[in-house]
């Protein structure tokens, strides 16, 4: 019952904060709980959800290439402009951070920070015009900060 109340609070905050992806995901989980399907589906989602979500996200990012809207020349030009090089470097860094974050949340099991990540995403969507896609990068920054802090402290 407590988990349902927490999900309803997250749903309310995400609707008020216009964090539609968080609201939709929360509704999905609440429906699964109402149908008593959570005992079967939650373990599968917890094990495979990030991977499946990443596949869909990457496929949507690759569509311009698959549609022929990105040419070989455009890809080559990435390496000849300062903006292209900067975008490539930032992408390398954020992808690295996402990997750190995924490892931190899943393999290392630090799910206790998830409420703070969700709350931060909802607040940023509501008041800063943000889009709540950053929990992996956020947890990656946390993991990187902890790595640096541990190196400095030892």
Curated annotation (Swiss-Prot):
Its main location: membrane. The keyword Transferase does not apply. The chain crosses the membrane at residues 5-25, 48-68, 82-102, 113-133. GO terms for cellular component: plasma membrane. Keywords: Cell membrane, Membrane, Transmembrane, Transmembrane helix. Pfam families: DUF441. Belongs to the UPF0756 family. It is a multi-pass membrane protein. It is found in: Cell membrane. This is UPF0756 membrane protein CKR_1028.
């Amino acid at each position: 019952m407590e988990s349902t109340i927490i999900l309803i609070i997250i749903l309310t905050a995400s609707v008020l904060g216009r964090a539609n992806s968080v609201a939709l995901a929360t509704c999905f989980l609440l429906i699964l709980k109402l149908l008593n399907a959570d005992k079967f589906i939650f373990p599968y989602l917890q094990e495979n959800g990030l991977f499946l979500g990443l596949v869909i996200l990457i496929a949507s990012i690759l569509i311009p290439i698959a549609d022929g809207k990105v040419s070989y020349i455009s890809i080559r030009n990435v390496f000849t402009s300062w903006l292209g090089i900067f975008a490539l470097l930032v992408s390398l860094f954020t992808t690295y951070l996402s990997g750190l974050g995924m490892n931190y949340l899943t393999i290392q099991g630090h799910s206790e920070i998830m409420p703070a990540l969700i709350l931060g995403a909802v607040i940023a969507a509501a008041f800063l015009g943000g889009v709540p896609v950053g929990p992996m990068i956020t947890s990656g920054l946390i993991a990187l900060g902890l790595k640096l802090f541990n190196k400095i402290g030892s």
